[in-house]
């Protein structure tokens, strides 16, 4: 398709958009009586209008049933997480018994590393991406320290080549091969939070397994954003947060994936708690742990139902829409945003460059724009003019045109505001 930088063309794309009605299913912050242009679904998704009803349902059950709500609520609390199995499995490409909801993202990665990072004197190294999200970096360092190794030796970061913004797949694969039988774990982000680069998880998993290592992924910026096939890719484990593209609310519960090949491995260590115990015998208060078969067996504590309620509202919307439709629009609207940025660059050369790969297979719903010069003033200008973007040091504005609630007209209007902001700043 040949794009045009006109309001009429953007509105034409909106008229053809198969997801256009979903924009009305979300609540937008307001600027001068109008919806803001919201580009920060990669940080915190908007609130679905249905979320309040799901929360109110739990509040009413709590008020009217109190403790009996565990078994007699409309959606009984004791097995509330089971409602997530089917929709989440479709979002991440898994079998329903391979996914669960619990805790928050870094907590879950720590718990999964109990099972899948089992260093020995010979095999103890972790391979990760350079400039992973800081919480992952702290996790790696603390895990390595806990096991008695030195981070500068045990953590191997794959770096970008000089003058390049993204990590080459060939460099990842060659490093995995070079570390070889010293490699205990490969743990990458599915999508790099800073650049928006999508990693080839299937190929990375195959390479890690070839060296005898376990392979996992932090899917914070991938779940609900890209096509995932965790089961078929043979990924050992993964975790994600739900408050970005999955719109569950600030700091809300995480999700986990554990491949079914590990479910019956009695030698696999894990930290245990009563909510991971055999569901049929959970309330018999037995002294010996008998894990639930499947990813639910990694649960530890009773689940926060009030937090899960808006999460359930969101995943049920995802089930209604389907990941294929989301990806079709994501590709088109991200490409249109990229086109708008290039059109502006023709007029105001040298003010910015896009760090994110141009190849659609290597990016998702994010364009990271590096600003030359004093970028913070431009960011502030956008915010003051009703464009909510995300600032990341050094000098990057991240733009996430989330397909469920961003429109093509939003992209056009953003371009007009951005151009004016550059010229005025």
From Swiss-Prot:
It comes from the Bacteria. Its EC number is 3.7.1.3. Pathway: Amino-acid degradation; L-kynurenine degradation; L-alanine and anthranilate from L-kynurenine: step 1/1; Cofactor biosynthesis; NAD(+) biosynthesis; quinolinate from L-kynurenine: step 2/3. Signal peptide: none annotated. One of its GO terms (molecular function) is kynureninase activity. Pyridoxal 5'-phosphate binds at residues 105-106, 133-136, 218, 221, 243, 274, 302. The modification N6-(pyridoxal phosphate)lysine is found at residue 244. It holds the Pfam family KYNU_C. The keyword GTP-binding does not apply. Keywords: Hydrolase, Pyridine nucleotide biosynthesis, Pyridoxal phosphate. Its cofactor is pyridoxal 5'-phosphate. One of its GO terms (cellular component) is cytoplasm. GO terms for biological process: anthranilate metabolic process; L-kynurenine catabolic process; L-tryptophan catabolic process to kynurenine; NAD biosynthetic process; quinolinate biosynthetic process. It catalyses: L-kynurenine + H2O = anthranilate + L-alanine + H(+); 3-hydroxy-L-kynurenine + H2O = 3-hydroxyanthranilate + L-alanine + H(+). InterPro entries: Aminotrans_V_dom, Kynureninase, PyrdxlP-dep_Trfase, PyrdxlP-dep_Trfase_major, PyrdxlP-dep_Trfase_small. HAMAP family: Kynureninase. Catalyzes the cleavage of L-kynurenine (L-Kyn) and L-3-hydroxykynurenine (L-3OHKyn) into anthranilic acid (AA) and 3-hydroxyanthranilic acid (3-OHAA), respectively. Belongs to the kynureninase family. Homodimer. This is Kynureninase.
């Amino acid at each position: 398709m040949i794009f045009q930088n006109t309001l009429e063309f953007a509105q034409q794309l909106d008229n053809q958009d198969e997801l256009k009605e979903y924009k009305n299913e979300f609540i937008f912050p307001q600027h001068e009586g109008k919806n803001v242009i919201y580009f920060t679904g990669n940080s915190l998704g908007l609130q679905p209008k249905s979320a309040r009803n799901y929360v109110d349902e739990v509040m009413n059950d709590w008020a009217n049933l109190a403790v009996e709500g565990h078994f007699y609520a409309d959606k009984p609390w004791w097995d509330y997480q089971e409602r997530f199995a089917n929709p989440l499995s479709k979002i991440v490409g898994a079998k329903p018994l391979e996914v669960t909801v619990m805790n928050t993202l870094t907590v879950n990665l720590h718990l999964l590393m109990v099972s899948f990072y089992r260093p020995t004197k010979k095999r103890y190294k972790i391979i990760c991406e350079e400039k992973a999200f800081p919480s992952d970096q702290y996790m790696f360092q603390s895990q390595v320290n806990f096991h008695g190794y030195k981070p500068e030796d045990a953590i191997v970061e794959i770096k970008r080549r000089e003058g390049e913004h993204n990590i080459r797949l060939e460099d990842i694969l060659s490093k995995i091969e070079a570390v070889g039988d010293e490699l205990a774990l490969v743990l990458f982000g599915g999508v790099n939070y800073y650049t928006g680069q999508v990693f080839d998880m299937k190929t990375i998993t195959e390479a890690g397994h070839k060296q005898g290592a376990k392979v996992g992924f932090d899917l914070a910026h991938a779940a609900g954003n890209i096509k995932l096939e965790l089961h078929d890719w043979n990924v050992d484990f993964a975790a994600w947060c739900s408050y970005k593209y999955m719109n569950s609310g600030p700091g809300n519960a995480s999700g986990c994936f554990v491949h079914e090949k590990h479910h019956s491995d009695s030698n696999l260590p894990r930290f245990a708690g009563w909510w991971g115990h055999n569901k049929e015998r959970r309330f018999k208060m037995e002294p010996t742990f008998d894990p639930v078969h499947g990813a639910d067996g990694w649960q530890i504590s009773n689940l926060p139902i009030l937090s899960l309620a808006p999460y359930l509202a969101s995943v049920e919307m995802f089930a209604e829409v389907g990941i294929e439709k989301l990806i079709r629009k994501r590709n088109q609207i991200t490409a249109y945003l990229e086109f708008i940025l290039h059109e502006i660059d023709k007029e105001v050369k040298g003010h910015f460059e896009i760090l994110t790969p141009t190849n659609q297979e290597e990016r998702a719903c994010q364009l990271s724009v590096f600003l030359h010069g004093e970028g913070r003033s431009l960011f502030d200008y956008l915010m003051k003019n009703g464009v909510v973007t995300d600032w990341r040091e050094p000098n990057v504005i991240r733009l996430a045109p989330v397909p469920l609630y961003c429109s093509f007209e939003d992209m056009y209007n953003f371009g007009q505001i951005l151009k004016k902001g550059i010229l005025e700043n």
